[in-house]
């Protein structure tokens, strides 16, 4: 049994936050004690399982010395074997006094500024590209590990749920539905997706084409103005940020991940878990996850014309979409299952603890 303390200092609900909640819950569900520390008001609080102990620390910024002391106090009180931090703020605020206590693992899901992570004893990256990035920056290769993300198996929807969502959104019964989901930020490429959607005909194969964009962020108003300028309002839906996006994945015929920069792509895994076909841009994450033609479709980043062509092709080919969705589900089962990822983390924890004991 391994006691692990997990710390995240953001309040959002992005990929890192969702994975923090999933992994903390999954580890606790295997009988390993878990303490999760978040900021007050963090959206992910309700995502933590009932077996996860939870505390809150302000973590106002990376120079919050009161929070440094509170984290040390929590570690001294709870006495974990492992302290795992997520993203820069939590990692910089976690300052272990010496090597006689728990092992500090920093978990990275992006190409973050290196200086924020040097205090840790070991590092976990969720892609090969991030592993290479860390080693190239001078981190010891023997202390950098790759463990992917996982997504939980969703509960099955039904026809009544789909019909309720359709009526809520005001989308015709026979419509093709394209889904975009994520933070409305420049790196996510939603401006390219809007430009591509504007190139599609309003009707394909006798079926109207609609686009749902789920998310919130700094570019929300900018993207809305772009959509208005392109004349897309009648076929575009903006449900905003959704704490539970599963109904939207199930409702869509095609999930498009148009990012210009994407280290991983949790939305790809989430779409696969709902048997939804995926079209993505060839970001580092897209290339690592997708085998083109087998479990998804890739197009160049920032190319609205190629994106539009691919959307048209996939919407017109039900068989191909079904094949890609099945391939995605199989990839998820074999490479990104909850069981495999939790097993990898527990094995890493034990390895690092054994090495610490030999020092």
Regions found by a protein language model. Name each.
Residues 37-38, 277-280, 290:
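Short hydrophobic beta-strand element within catalytic cores of glycosyltransferases
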Residues 129, 150:
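Carbohydrate-associated surface elements
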Residues 63-67, 85-91, 108:
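Short His-centered aromatic/hydrophobic patch
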């Amino acid at each position: 049994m391994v006691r692990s303390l997990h710390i995240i200092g953001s309040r959002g609900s992005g990929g890192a936050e969702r994975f923090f909640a999933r992994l903390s819950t999954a580890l606790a569900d295997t009988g390993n004690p878990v303490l999760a520390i978040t900021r007050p008001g963090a959206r992910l609080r309700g995502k933590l399982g009932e077996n996860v102990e939870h505390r809150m620390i302000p973590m106002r910024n990376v120079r919050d010395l009161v929070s440094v002391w509170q984290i040390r106090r929590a570690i001294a009180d709870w006495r974990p074997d492992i302290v795992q931090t997520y993203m820069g703020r939590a990692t910089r605020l976690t300052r272990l006094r010496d090597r006689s206590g728990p092992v500090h693992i920093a978990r990275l899901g992006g190409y973050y500024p290196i200086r924020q992570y040097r205090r840790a004893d070991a590092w976990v990256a969720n892609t090969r590209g991030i592993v290479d990035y860390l080693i190239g920056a001078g981190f010891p290769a023997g202390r950098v590990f790759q463990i992917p993300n996982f997504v939980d198996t969703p509960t099955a929807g039904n026809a009544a749920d789909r019909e309720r969502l359709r009526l809520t959104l005001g989308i015709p019964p026979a419509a093709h539905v394209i889904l975009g989901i994520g933070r409305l930020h420049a790196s996510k490429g939603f401006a390219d997706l809007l430009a591509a959607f504007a190139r599609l005909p309003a009707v394909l194969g006798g079926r109207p084409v609609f686009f749902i964009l789920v998310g919130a962020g700094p570019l929300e108003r900018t993207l809305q103005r772009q959509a208005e300028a392109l004349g897309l309002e009648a076929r575009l839906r903006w449900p905003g940020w959704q704490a539970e996006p599963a109904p939207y994945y199930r409702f869509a015929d095609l999930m498009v991940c148009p990012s210009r920069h994407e280290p991983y792509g949790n939305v790809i895994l989430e779409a696969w878990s709902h048997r939804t076909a995926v079209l993505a841009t060839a970001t580092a994450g897209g290339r690592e996850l997708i085998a083109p033609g087998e479990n998804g479709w890739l197009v160049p980043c920032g190319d609205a014309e190629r994106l539009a062509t691919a959307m048209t092709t996939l919407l017109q080919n039900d068989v191909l979409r079904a094949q890609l969705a099945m391939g995605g589900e199989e990839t998820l089962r074999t490479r990104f299952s909850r069981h495999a990822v939790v097993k990898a983390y527990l094995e890493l924890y034990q390895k690092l603890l054994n090495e610490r004991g030999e020092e």
